[in-house]
């Protein structure tokens, strides 16, 4: 049973004379030396989202805007210095500006709807007037003070509001304006308050809601910040007005995000919130540090709201459930989905209904704290953007191109009222549900069934019981598991609530919860029918739809080999894994994803102490990853191997997530490494050694090379992610450290770049028979198809430019992807020396030369050699060039160990240890944009490891099929098992 702390607070009722004026001594707005928030347009892909989150963008405002493939335009809200830093990481930004003419026209067309909180005719005065003019239905009170001492006002709306005890009726909270710039949200709650008052006694539905429940309205949860957005240059301020450094000024380094400051999961990681005061998602110096946070927390504890809606903008989403961990369903999602709807059937037209963390995460937010600390089920609508609503009437004066930002909802009574009206059905359905909180009044007709079983078709139980799970309405009594084995008599077991796992579970279970019981005495080959029964709160019998599973024949043992080779053909390498386990005295069962599908965490994985999950050529599915995540969460131990291990999975529609790799496997980033010859263990795998080679029919082209999560998220601050390097590829430099020595030449990715590393080679005394060549080591990580490395050459003084192929076969003549669309050649017209656009593709030759390039990932350092015989007797300028398009990119291009070869003898070696030597950086050719960064000497960007260990997992960047020696395979598995069971 959920226990809710009761705070006994003295709360002042406020009428006209009851509000104390805010203190006069406050931090003042920054002057000319301060940086304001500026709107920027960026063309980005989902792969670049982590850079935007690091810069402080809110994932919930961005995620829906990014397509599964390619890139899209988004708005960012950054200072100029923040934008410069982001631009330095390769994101192409352009300041968004609205012409003075358009701004003046819109100002003249505006209806004057939006008003500050304080001051004459402000929202605060309207709130007080509402309490005075509706004494039988409304009561106004302060729930606390802001940083600057303003009252945060709440309106209680119910029959006999001033006489009834707060929280004595089922209560709903309508909350808005946590983020200062989201002006449409106070209009939503303000209008909703008046909608109830105006229709009371006229509309039976409204009258019933007001008579039987309490409706509370906090029209501005951030009055200081909201007022600040009405001052010059501060329209896009998001946070509260905490003066973080105490200098008496408000600059971009001040303020705390009120929706990242709540104690529940506060600072769980640095993706869902930021430790940086300049970030828009700065979480504050400590959990619950802000007075605005304290006010809402104590308010929720005092009133005990059943439901709440926390209005935000601007993204056209309707969010609910877990925010702190990606794609995590909960028992209460049954109700959330019934009320919010689905992506295909949303409760608010035009919005996308989904779990808060469907793609990206937040932590310390109001919703999670409300549910898991204060027992309040809270939704977050992200209301419509300026761009969207400005399109609705082509005949009006509002044009999407004139939007200063998507937060600048048009000052149009017609558009604001339309946005409000489409939100009414959802708002009313939530209030109605408060009266019977576990039986939702869905506005879209979606039921909330009493039972939702966790079904599966195959059980791998052997000599133990099979646990089954079901999500059940908590008010159902006599919750019972029923089952029959092979059609025999009915057996029953009492269902017990699941307490949760090591990381998640046991939360977000206010009205529904997961319950479990065990099926006993089923043997291999048996068919078991399962269903669940109980009695409703009214005493009526209720039951689930039955499901049936078969107990499979499988070897006795505590380890499962999870074969995940990709495709639909049966696994080829599973026997290598079972043999290595057998050599360690362990019998193993096998589950083949290709032929058996996704394994059930309960039906299959739970019956094993260890799972050895190996991957093949294909990226593992999200469904398999989630099953393995459930297994580890419930105490299982995991060994994960293969080239695809420790990378990203596709959550759907091209949305890649590496959260499982980062937070469960300890691999913060992954790169590929081509054909490492050996592995040497370290740390908990110390002493393990293995020679590596290609597997039959499959070369080792991209062995995993990982950075360690604990190197980024330090264990003293993030002990839950403790991880360590457990081995290397000896003698191999990983892709982003020098091939030799301590320095190399690096062209780190920037969008729209044409970076040249050039030198002149004097071949006036050479002959073609001497086979002159330029040799170098090259490592690159580019957006496949779209960005490239080319080696350009021309005779000094002539315009006979061409690109040179790699004599070692590393280059290709394929034209850039979508070259025919023209955007790449428009950005870099010099490329027409080598490319000719066509109707469906570009030809690999141009006005003076041929096209040869490197694209994608080199998976480590490659030896490259280009033939210079055509320039014998001349001087030739050669350039290693990194050329990128306007969209996303990889890490860039890297060069080391350059040398000239003439007659088989190398000379003029340059490894960039002290200088660029004969090389120079001439900048982009005429017609290309200027580079925001260029080639430069660099030390290692980072070191990557071949294996990683955590408390519960061991990760290898290669598979046992890449280990020719059975003895080595045995020892690797032995070390991994020992590391997991110390």
Where are the model-predicted features located?
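Secretory targeting and sorting signals
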Residues: 1-27
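Metallocarboxypeptidase
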Residues: 230-241, 245-247, 251-447
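Extracellular ligand-binding/catalytic regions of CAZymes and related secreted enzymes
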Residues: 295, 416-435, 552-558, 671, ...
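Aromatic-Pro/Gly-enriched surface loop or interdomain linker
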Residues: 533-610, 614, 643, 664, ...
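A glycine-rich, often tryptophan-bearing local segment used as a flexible ligand/cofactor-contacting loop or short
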Residues: 613, 618-708
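Extracellular glycan-recognition surfaces and repeat-rich motifs
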Residues: 687-755, 784, 802-862, 910-944
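Extracellular beta-strand-rich recognition modules
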Residues: 770-781, 789, 793, 875-884, ...
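Extracellular carbohydrate recognition
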Residues: 786-788, 859, 884-902, 966-970
């Amino acid at each position: 049973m959920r226990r809710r702390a009761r705070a006994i607070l003295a709360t002042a009722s406020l009428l006209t004379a009851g509000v104390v004026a805010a203190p006069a001594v406050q931090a003042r707005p920054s002057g000319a030396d301060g940086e304001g928030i500026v709107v920027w347009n960026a063309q980005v892909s989902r792969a670049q989202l982590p850079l935007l989150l690091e810069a402080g963008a809110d994932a919930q405002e961005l995620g829906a805007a990014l397509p599964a493939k390619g890139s899209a335009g988004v708005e960012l809200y950054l200072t100029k210095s923040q934008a410069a830093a982001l631009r330095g990481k390769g994101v192409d930004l352009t300041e968004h500006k609205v012409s003075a003419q358009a701004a003046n026209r819109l100002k003249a067309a505006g209806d004057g709807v939006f008003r500050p909180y304080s001051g004459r005719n402000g929202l605060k005065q309207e709130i007080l007037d509402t309490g005075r003019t509706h004494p039988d239905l409304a009561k106004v009170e302060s729930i606390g003070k802001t940083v600057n001492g303003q009252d945060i006002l709440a309106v209680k709306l119910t029959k006999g509001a001033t006489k009834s005890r707060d929280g004595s009726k089922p209560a709903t909270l309508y909350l808005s304006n946590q983020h200062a710039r989201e002006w449409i949200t106070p209009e939503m709650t303000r209008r909703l308050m008046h909608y109830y008052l105006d229709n009371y006694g006229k509309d039976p539905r409204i009258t019933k809601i007001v008579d039987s429940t309490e409706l509370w309205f906090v029209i501005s949860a951030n009055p200081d910040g909201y007022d600040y957005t009405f001052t010059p240059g501060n329209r896009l301020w998001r946070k509260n007005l905490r003066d973080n450094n105490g200098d008496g000024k408000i600059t971009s380094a001040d303020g705390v995000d009120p929706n990242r400051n709540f104690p529940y999961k506060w600072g769980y990681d640095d993706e869902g919130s930021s430790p940086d005061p300049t970030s828009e998602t700065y979480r504050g110096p400590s959990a619950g540090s802000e007075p605005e946070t304290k006010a809402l927390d104590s308010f929720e504890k005092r009133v005990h709201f059943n439901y709440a809606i926390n209005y935000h903008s601007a993204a056209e989403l309707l969010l609910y459930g877990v925010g702190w961990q990606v794609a995590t369903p909960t028992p209460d999602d049954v109700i959330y989905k019934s009320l919010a709807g689905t992506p295909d059937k949303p409760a608010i037209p035009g919005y996308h209904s989904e779990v808060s963390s469907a793609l990206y995460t937040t932590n310390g937010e109001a919703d999670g704290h409300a549910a898991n600390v204060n027992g309040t089920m809270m939704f977050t609508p992200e209301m419509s953007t300026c761009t969207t609503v400005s399109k609705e009437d082509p005949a009006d004066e509002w044009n999407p191109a004139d939007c200063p930002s998507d937060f600048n909802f048009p000052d149009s009574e017609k558009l604001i009222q339309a946005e409000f009206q489409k939100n009414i059905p959802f708002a009313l359905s939530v209030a109605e549900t408060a009266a019977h909180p576990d039986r939702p009044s869905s506005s879209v007709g979606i039921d909330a069934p009493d039972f939702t079983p966790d079904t599966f078709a195959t059980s791998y139980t052997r000599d133990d019981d099979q646990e089954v799970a079901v999500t059940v309405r908590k008010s159902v009594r006599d919750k019972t598991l029923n089952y029959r084995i092979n059609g025999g008599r009915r057996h029953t077991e009492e269902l017990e609530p699941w307490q949760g796992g090591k990381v998640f579970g046991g939360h977000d279970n206010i009205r529904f919860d997961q319950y479990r019981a065990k099926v006993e005495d089923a043997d291999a080959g048996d068919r078991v029918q399962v269903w669940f029964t109980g009695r409703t709160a009214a005493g009526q019998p209720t039951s689930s739809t039955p499901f049936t599973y078969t107990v499979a024949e499988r070897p006795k043992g505590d380890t499962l080999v999870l074969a995940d080779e990709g495709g639909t053909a049966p696994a080829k390498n599973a026997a290598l894994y079972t043999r290595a386990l057998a050599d360690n005295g362990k019998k193993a069962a096998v589950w083949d994803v290709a032929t058996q599908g996704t394994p059930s965490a309960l039906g299959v994985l739970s019956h094993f102490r260890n799972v050895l999950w190996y991957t093949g050529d294909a990226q593992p599915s999200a469904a398999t990853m989630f099953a393995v995540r459930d297994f580890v969460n419930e105490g299982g131990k995991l060994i994960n191997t293969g080239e695809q291990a420790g990378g990203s999975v596709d959550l759907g529609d091209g949305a890649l997530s590496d959260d499982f790799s980062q937070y469960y496997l300890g691999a913060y980033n992954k790169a590929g490494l081509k054909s490492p010859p050996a592995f040497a263990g370290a740390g908990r795998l110390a002493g393990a050694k293995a020679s590596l080679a290609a597997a039959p029919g499959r070369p080792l082209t991209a062995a995993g090379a990982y950075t360690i999560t604990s190197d980024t998220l330090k264990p003293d601050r993030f002990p839950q992610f403790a991880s360590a390097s457990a081995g290397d590829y000896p003698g191999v430099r990983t892709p982003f450290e020098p091939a030799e020595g301590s320095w190399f030449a690096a062209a780190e990715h920037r969008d729209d770049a044409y970076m040249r590393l050039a030198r002149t080679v004097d071949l006036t005394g050479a002959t073609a028979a001497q086979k002159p060549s330029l040799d170098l080591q090259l490592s690159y990580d580019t957006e496949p198809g779209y960005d490239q490395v080319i080696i350009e050459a021309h005779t000094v003084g002539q315009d006979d430019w061409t690109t040179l192929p790699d004599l070692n076969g590393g280059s290709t003549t394929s034209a850039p992807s979508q070259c025919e669309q023209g955007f790449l050649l428009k950005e870099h017209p010099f490329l027409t020396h080598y490319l000719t656009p066509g109707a469906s593709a570009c030809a690999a030759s141009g006005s003076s030369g041929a096209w040869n390039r490197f694209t994608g990932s080199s998976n480590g350092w490659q030896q490259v050699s280009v033939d210079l015989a055509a320039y014998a007797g001349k001087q030739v300028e050669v350039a290693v060039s990194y050329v990128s398009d306007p969209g996303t990119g990889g890490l860039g291009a890297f060069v080391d160990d350059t040398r000239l070869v003439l007659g088989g003898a190398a000379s003029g070696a340059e490894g960039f240890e002290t200088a660029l030597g004969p090389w120079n950086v001439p900048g982009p050719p005429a017609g290309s944009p200027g580079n925001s960064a260029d080639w430069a000497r660099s030390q290692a960007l980072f070191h990557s490891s071949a294996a990683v260990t955590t408390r519960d997992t061991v990760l290898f960047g290669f598979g046992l099929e890449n280990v020719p020696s059975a003895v080595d395979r045995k020892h690797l598995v032995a070390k991994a098992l020992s590391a997991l069971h110390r």
